[in-house]
A protein has these predicted regions:
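Conserved active-site segments centered on acidic
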Residues: 1-79, 144-156
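Hydrophobic beta-strand core positions in alpha/beta domains
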Residues: 7, 84-85
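Alpha-helix N-cap/helix-start capping motif
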Residues: 17, 87-88
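Phosphate-binding/catalytic loops
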Residues: 82, 88-156
Length: 156
């Protein structure tokens, strides 16, 4: 059973912290206890969430004020049971760090094909809203999948 989910993007200041917060909420709504975290392939350790991600998060009832970016490390990859990336190049980096077999591009895992989640960094709030809406849909699908897998595991 999956105990820890790790989201990966580039800077760990936009997409992955939003996705982590959205999945945490979706899992809680489904009664699942799964640790959710995030990291970036090119993150500056300690950087706060971008202003756009922070503001759009607030609009959705998410508080990213305490978020601090983390660089993706082998240790984070080893500790995660499931790693979901925003793009294929992030997946390649996870593979390099030993994550083969437990990494997927988010859209693929959510059953939406191989579409990547585009980076809103530098865009206006409308771009961030579009990204957050996409992440909301994808993370709901992930939560549904994890809930179904958990239910199957309980029946064994």
């Amino acid at each position: 059973m999956i105990q820890t989910v790790l989201f990966v993007c580039t800077g760990n200041i936009c997409r992955s912290p939003l996705a982590a917060s959205l999945l945490e909420r979706a899992l809680k709504e489904r009664g699942l206890e799964v640790a959710v975290t995030s990291a970036g392939t090119g993150a500056w350790d300690g950087a706060p969430a971008s202003e756009g991600a922070y503001l759009v998060g607030l609009e959705r009832g998410l508080d990213l004020s305490g978020h601090r970016a983390r660089l993706l490390t082998r240790e984070l990859v080893e500790r995660a049971d499931l790693i979901l990336t925003m793009a294929r190049h992030h997946r390649a980096r996870v593979d390099e760090l030993g994550g083969e077999g437990k990494v997927s591009v988010l859209g693929e895992y959510a059953g939406r094909g191989g579409d990547e989640v585009s980076d809103p960094f530098g865009g206006d709030l409308g771009v961030y809203r579009d990204t957050c809406q996409e992440l909301e849909s994808l993370t709901a699908a992930v939560a549904d999948r994890l809930a179904a897998e958990s239910k199957r595991g309980d029946q064994r």
